[in-house]
């Protein structure tokens, strides 16, 4: 049985409210869960301490038993200091795209041609 620490959605339409639960990975998103370990209310301001509340002892116990947090829950756990989120590296993100390279080359060529005419 593969356990996940994940979010289950509650609340009304356009007013989401999430419980952070430990559940079998095969169970539905809002289906049966083993234990509730926290809540997340995205409608509260970001600086509100009650926006995310976690029961750290329970979470640490489940992590020790092998439960895997989902990406969003791992962000919450990292912010609370309960788990470490691995750093991601995307070296191509900072590299300019194909069209940007072409525009830069055209600009450099145009600037080079302008310097020759002035000299």
UniProtKB/Swiss-Prot annotation:
Keyword Ribonucleoprotein appears in the UniProt entry: yes
Gene Ontology annotations for the cellular component aspect, listed alphabetically: cytoplasm; small ribosomal subunit
GO biological process, one term: translation
GO molecular function (one): structural constituent of ribosome
Region of interest (Disordered), residue spans: 81-119
SUPFAM superfamilies assigned to the protein according to its UniProt record, in alphabetical order: Ribosomal protein S16
Keywords: Ribonucleoprotein, Ribosomal protein
HAMAP family in UniProt: Ribosomal_bS16
The family this protein is said to belong to: Belongs to the bacterial ribosomal protein bS16 family.
Name of the featured protein: Small ribosomal subunit protein bS16
Organism expressing this protein natively: Methylobacterium sp. (strain 4-46)
């Amino acid at each position: 049985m593969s356990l996940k620490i994940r979010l289950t959605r509650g609340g009304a339409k356009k007013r989401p409210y999430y419980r952070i639960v430990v559940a079998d990975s095969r169970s539905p998103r809002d289906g049966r869960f083993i234990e509730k370990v926290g809540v997340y209310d995205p409608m509260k301001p970001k600086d509100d301490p009650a926006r995310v509340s976690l029961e750290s002892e329970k979470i640490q116990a489940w992590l020790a038993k092998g439960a895997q947090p989902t990406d969003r829950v791992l962000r919450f756990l990292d912010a609370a200091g309960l788990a470490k989120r691995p750093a991601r590296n995307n070296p191509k993100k900072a590299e300019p795209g194909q069209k940007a390279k072409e525009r830069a080359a055209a600009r450099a060529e145009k600037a080079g041609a302008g310097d020759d005419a002035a000299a």
